[in-house]
């Protein structure tokens, strides 16, 4: 079973580069294997009934259940509001199904808090090899116009590697932390430059922007560490609160013609954001309900006429996590979401080792920015990508932090 986990840690980033859609399946399988491994271990020790429940949250026992509740009360409030919003959404049944799926995945992450493994060095090496393989596979596909992809698909477009690039950009930060922990600072810098170049020639603008800003965040977190938490918190929360207002005020036609004439996909984003901002004004407090974006009706006169082409103003989701939260859950949901953002930034700031803290900030911002530009916040593969990073941090990074502290 440990060999299987070792193989998956290698395969998820490398296989994910070629077939981004497989990320959801492979990461979910990875999490289930970890849980099964731990269950088998407890059963063999005949300690399953009590210790499994205790180790769901390692620092607390049965007598401290209320402490656990208080520790995750912000998460519980957010989950409760998401559930309540399912009751008044456009399609309650569909929203409840999505709600169940999303928070079942998040609970699976919670259960994975119990996991500990021996031979961590092998797991680290497997992840590093997986990242190197993913990089090589990208350049093979890029230079050969999808030689490997066309073996099992009829055509190839560079956009097919977008999900793999997104996964690579956030997973690379875990490897950078590992390299720093081993004193290989130059190797960490080289890896960052190589991945940055890869993303710059890819079709994934969101990943490139997120990874680039992540690098800037790393430097700032090291240089001004005393005030960095306040700076990043104020910037992130203020920017998130202002974004719906900015999206309402922009002129997408004018901006698209001036700056995005050669990037139709990015231009379409501006129209989507402007449309969503106008929809938010109609139901600003409560929103339209959990996972309701793709069910919001649009009339013919709301269709976008851009360069003689008709574009949909809201195709499935807003392509921006802040706008999606505000649209679906209202200002109440956005406030709870930003409380979670503050909480997780504070937890990162509590890390004592400077390089670990800086790289963790970078990874968080990288993930946050990609979500601000591209993906549906409730998308299974994107949620699992975040869980994948958290589990890697727990398995491969946290033991080093504890030892160093």
Swiss-Prot record:
Belongs to the O-antigen ligase family. Keywords: Membrane, Transmembrane, Transmembrane helix. It is found in: Membrane. GO terms for cellular component: membrane. It is a multi-pass membrane protein. The keyword Kinase does not apply. It comes from Rickettsia typhi (strain ATCC VR-144 / Wilmington). It comes from the Bacteria. Its main location: membrane. This is Putative polysaccharide ligase RT0347. The chain crosses the membrane at residues 23-43, 77-97, 120-140, 156-178, 201-221, 227-247, 270-290, 322-342, 353-375, 377-397. It holds the Pfam family Wzy_C. PANTHER family: LIPOPOLYSACCHARIDE BIOSYNTHESIS PROTEIN PA4999-RELATED, TEICHURONIC ACID BIOSYNTHESIS PROTEIN TUAE.
């Amino acid at each position: 079973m440990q060999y299987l986990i070792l193989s998956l840690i290698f395969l998820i980033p490398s296989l994910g580069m070629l077939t981004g859609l497989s990320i959801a399946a492979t990461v979910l399988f990875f999490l289930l294997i970890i849980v099964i491994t731990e269950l088998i271990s407890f059963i063999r020790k005949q300690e399953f009934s009590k210790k499994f429940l205790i180790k769901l949250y390692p620092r607390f026992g049965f007598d401290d259940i209320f402490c656990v509740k208080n520790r995750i009360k912000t998460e519980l409030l957010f989950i409760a509001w998401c559930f309540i919003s399912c009751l008044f959404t456009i399609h309650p049944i569909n929203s409840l199904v999505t709600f169940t799926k999303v928070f079942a995945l998040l609970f699976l992450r919670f259960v994975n808090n119990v996991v500990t493994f021996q031979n961590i060095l092998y797991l680290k090496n497997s992840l590093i090899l997986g990242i190197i393989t993913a990089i090589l596979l990208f350049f093979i596909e890029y230079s050969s116009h999808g030689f490997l992809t066309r073996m099992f698909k009829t055509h190839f477009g560079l956009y097919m590697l977008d999900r793999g690039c997104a996964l690579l950009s956030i997973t690379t930060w875990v490897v950078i932390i590992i390299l720093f922990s081993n004193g290989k600072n130059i190797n960490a810098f080289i890896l960052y430059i190589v991945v940055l170049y890869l993303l710059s020639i890819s079709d994934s603008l969101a990943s490139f922007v997120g990874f680039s800003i992540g690098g800037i965040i790393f430097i700032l977190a090291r240089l001004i560490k005393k005030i960095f938490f306040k700076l990043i918190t104020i910037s992130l929360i203020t920017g998130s609160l202002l974004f719906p207002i900015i999206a309402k005020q922009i002129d997408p036609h004018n901006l698209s013609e001036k700056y995005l004439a050669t990037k139709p996909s990015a231009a379409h984003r501006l129209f989507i954001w402007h449309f969503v901002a106008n929809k938010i004004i109609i139901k600003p407090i409560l929103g339209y309900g959990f996972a309701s974006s793709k069910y919001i009706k649009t009339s013919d006169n709301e269709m976008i006429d851009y360069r003689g082409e008709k574009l949909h103003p809201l195709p499935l989701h807003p392509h921006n996590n802040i706008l999606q939260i505000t649209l679906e859950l209202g200002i109440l949901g956005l406030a709870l979401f930003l409380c979670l953002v503050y909480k997780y930034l504070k937890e990162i700031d509590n890390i004592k080792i400077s390089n670990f803290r800086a790289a963790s900030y970078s990874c968080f911002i990288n993930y946050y920015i990609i979500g601000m530009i591209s993906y549906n916040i409730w998308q299974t593969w994107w949620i699992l990508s975040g869980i994948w990073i958290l589990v890697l941090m727990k398995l491969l990074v946290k033991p080093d932090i504890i030892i160093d502290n």
